[in-house]
Amino acid sequence: MANTTFNGAVRSENGFKTVSKNATTGVYTDKAVMNSSGNLYTTAGGHLQYAAATGYGPSDLVIGKGGSQYGTANPWAESSTQLFPLGTKLIYGNNVYRYGLLGGTAVTAGKLVQHQAQDSDHLNMTATAAVSAGETDISVETGGTDLTLNEYADGYLWVNDVNGEGQTMRVKSNPAHDHSSDPSVVITTYDALVTALTTSSQLSLIHNPYSGMVIAPATETGAVMGATVIDMTADYYGWFTVSGPQALLTVGTLVLGNIAVRSGGTDGGVAPATDNVLTEIGEVMAVNANTEYSLIWMNIQ
């Protein structure tokens, strides 16, 4: 029944299986089983992949270490090549990870990372023409700084003021852009505008938050996106903890069961919560000394 197409419902009293056949031995191996109770079992985790079609962006979920046929989902490994869409979520045991790209500076294990700082030339840009509701191509005039091809792909374009303000769209693509030649550039989004724009509308851009991440500086320049699991090489791809137990650099004296926050004094570290309004990272599970690594139940997503 290989490659058989059915028109209508398919029923089975005892469930379904997907199998693979060894070309040499002819032995069949179960890859996934849905039993008669509707429970789904896979031999090595699973990968729910939303195939990117016109108008839709990738939204991948991997369940289980190694649970993907497209690449090994291993939080304790890094690679120079991209294996998954940036932002892919991995659930493994009690932990949740996000797949990302580190920026141009290496970061050791157990450090908080944030998204790359926004380019001020791509903030408060004006629309160069009115854009009707239902459109996905939006022309803006930048304040400077050239754009490389698809630099903002899977980042965000939002209307920050005047007509259409409050709308946030995921970026699908942008062309290479030389500001000295033409200050305007067309940004294409996955989803269409709901409220029309005018030439008075102001818009801003930010990169994919999981692209080009940096150690979270003591003086904040963005939001915390996760924590390094291993010593990571500059410009390499890997997994970053966002939820569950993670050893993090300790700054000061943490208290069991209390909240740990982003450190305002040491890059990449966590500190006890004080009156300062800093990002809550999670709850303290086990305390180690200042400059050592305490176990934190992270909960940033």
Describe these PLM feature segments:
Residues 154-161:
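Short conserved beta-strand and strand-loop elements enriched in small hydrophobics
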